[in-house]
Amino acid sequence: MMATYEGCYTDAQALRIAVVVARFNDLVTGKLLSGCLDCLARHGVDTSSNSEQLDVAWVPGAFELPIVTQTLALSGQYQVVITLGAVIRGDTPHFDVVVAEASKGIASVSRETGVPVIFGVLTTDTMQQALERAGIKSNLGWSYGLQALEMGSLMAVLRSATSAS
């Protein structure tokens, strides 16, 4: 019989979550974090300042997201890590380098550790586009929080199913 595995958004109390936020472009990343925390709180995650369920780490920029994400994932304390950043195109190739290295680094953390890592790094041509994605039109931070809940839950289901067989 074919098995179907899905995560859910309702079992958030069982998850311990880390959020790694890039300080560069903090006008945008702060809004992403607010949206993310709002989503998590509305789904039952304790987001208070004395939470035992959630930790937030700030890094200088998107380029530094992978190493801190990897450190947190390897700690064994978290079932899912969310990365938040905003890289906005400028007049030099710096944008391409930062985006490529941050995305490759973040993806490798998930593969190497088995901990789901949510890629919440906006890559836009303008500040206006970034702000539209962080709250003016919608807040993708909310979506990243929802993805974290689903992936954390799905991984628990998969681990339970594979250990039972």
From Swiss-Prot:
GO cellular component: cytosol; riboflavin synthase complex
Pathway linked to the protein: Cofactor biosynthesis; riboflavin biosynthesis; riboflavin from 2-hydroxy-3-oxobutyl phosphate and 5-amino-6-(D-ribitylamino)uracil: step 1/2
GO molecular function: 6,7-dimethyl-8-ribityllumazine synthase activity
List of catalytic residues: 94 (proton donor)
Enzyme Commission numbers on file: 2.5.1.78
Binding residue positions for (2S)-2-hydroxy-3-oxobutyl phosphate: 91-92, 133
Protein name from the UniProt record: 6,7-dimethyl-8-ribityllumazine synthase
Residues noted as binding 5-amino-6-(D-ribitylamino)uracil in the record, renumbered to the chain: 24, 62-64, 86-88, 119
GO biological process: riboflavin biosynthetic process
Domain of life: Bacteria
Keyword Acetylation in record: no
Key word Nucleotide-binding present: no
Record's keyword terms, sorted: Riboflavin biosynthesis, Transferase
CDD domains assigned: Lumazine_synthase-I
Top EC class of this enzyme: transferase
Record-stated family: Belongs to the DMRL synthase family.
A Pfam family: DMRL_synthase
Reactions catalysed according to its record: (2S)-2-hydroxy-3-oxobutyl phosphate + 5-amino-6-(D-ribitylamino)uracil = 6,7-dimethyl-8-(1-D-ribityl)lumazine + phosphate + 2 H2O + H(+)
Role description: Catalyzes the formation of 6,7-dimethyl-8-ribityllumazine by condensation of 5-amino-6-(D-ribitylamino)uracil with 3,4-dihydroxy-2-butanone 4-phosphate. This is the penultimate step in the biosynthesis of riboflavin.
